[in-house]
Amino acid sequence: MKNILIRSILLFVALTAFVRAGVLEIVITEGIDTARPIAVVPFQWKGEGKAPNELTDVIAADLMRSGKFNPIPVSAMPQRPAADDEIDYSAWAKMGVEAILVGSIEPYSVDRYMVKFEVIDVLRGQITGGNSQMLRNGELVQSNDHVLDSRSSVIDGDQFRSYAHRISDVAYEALTGERGAFMTKIAYVTVNHDDRYPYKLAVADYDGANEKILLRSPEPLMSPAWSPDGNKLAYVSFENKTAEIFMQDIYTTRREKLTSFPGINGNPVFSPDGKKLAMVLSKDGNPELYVFDIKTKDLQRVTRNRTIDTEPNWTPDGESLVFTSERGGRPQLYSVNLSSGQVRRLTFDGEQNLGGTLVPSGEDMILVNRTRGNYHIAKQEFPRGNMQVLTKTSLDESPSVAPNGSMVIYSTTHNNKQVLALVSIDGRFKARLPATDGEIKSPAWSPFM
């Protein structure tokens, strides 16, 4: 941060939210061949004329991007059922399809629509023919145990895309037992030096759609971090020719300056309860970790070391911080207990390890590992254990984990430009999210919303 060139231009703050079409497009680079084959059948339109929207394109893309599923092409489908009683299970089983999502859309009132859908287990349906029975209150009734989930909702005409993400969440959980994260968002910084205001802080759906610009600036913006309720972002701005930490509501765009100490004000991260921020300050000398109480403005110094301590992240219980430190000679990851002050080294593999963040379960830590001069995203058992390198890209940085722990978004370099990329937590699925103009960096995945 000390090397950033400060230019003498006034800041422009976009206090009115600006929404535009997504500037990110996910390009899958690896992993679909190992995913489970499923079918997302086009929903049957039960109205006149053309259907108002196509849900299934979004759903199929969501499930494919999870890295766990490989939806077959619509052209390869042996039939297009709209409900479980229309399914020819043998035909689907012959294709190796494990599950089917079917549904329908019908007019409900002016610009409102009834959407029905079912998630079907093909193998179970093939065994029972969809007609298995169970004993209930002394009587045999149809069990429908091949129907993993079945729902209906009335939605407005402008809610098709968001409801498609909702259906994806339901299908993902029905098929994996884990909560889906398709209705989440990402925050990031875009940089285009050809613009009058080159730096933009933006929020979009996890897939890059519905981008909303929160802030435009001629000076650098960095390190966005979500509040646990998903309503606010904390970030660093150089708008006043020095590093300062701000907090901003993503819906009202109202913002508040939190710190403006001499020197570095960086790496703000909300505590799990949303009441505090961990951050890096150099007001007392070299960069150290501090905890800032958002309500009282009280400041607690956490580390005292002659070298740099930076990149704090909270453990899920809120009792400790994971951070990067050069106290051992090279950057490595450590943890510090906020009550006792006890510091523990966590990483030993490779030349350097930086930017540690825990998955929601607290069982693994995602980090940037440098080995033979290459920076890759890696996973290590927490607090200590085996390390697995997840990526093949280079110059990887700023990993952020999905709230269900299934995916990691991070910044990397592709064709000499900074882009965002995705990798599944097991490293099998990989994708890029290049910007259509300029560069993009500092991603932060939202909590469940």
Curated annotation (Swiss-Prot):
It is found in: Periplasm. GO terms for cellular component: periplasmic space. Gene3D superfamilies: TolB, C-terminal domain, TolB, N-terminal domain. The keyword Cell cycle applies. GO terms for biological process: cell division; protein import. Part of the Tol-Pal system, which plays a role in outer membrane invagination during cell division and is important for maintaining outer membrane integrity. HAMAP family: TolB. Belongs to the TolB family. The Tol-Pal system is composed of five core proteins: the inner membrane proteins TolA, TolQ and TolR, the periplasmic protein TolB and the outer membrane protein Pal. They form a network linking the inner and outer membranes and the peptidoglycan layer. This is Tol-Pal system protein TolB. It comes from Idiomarina loihiensis (strain ATCC BAA-735 / DSM 15497 / L2-TR).
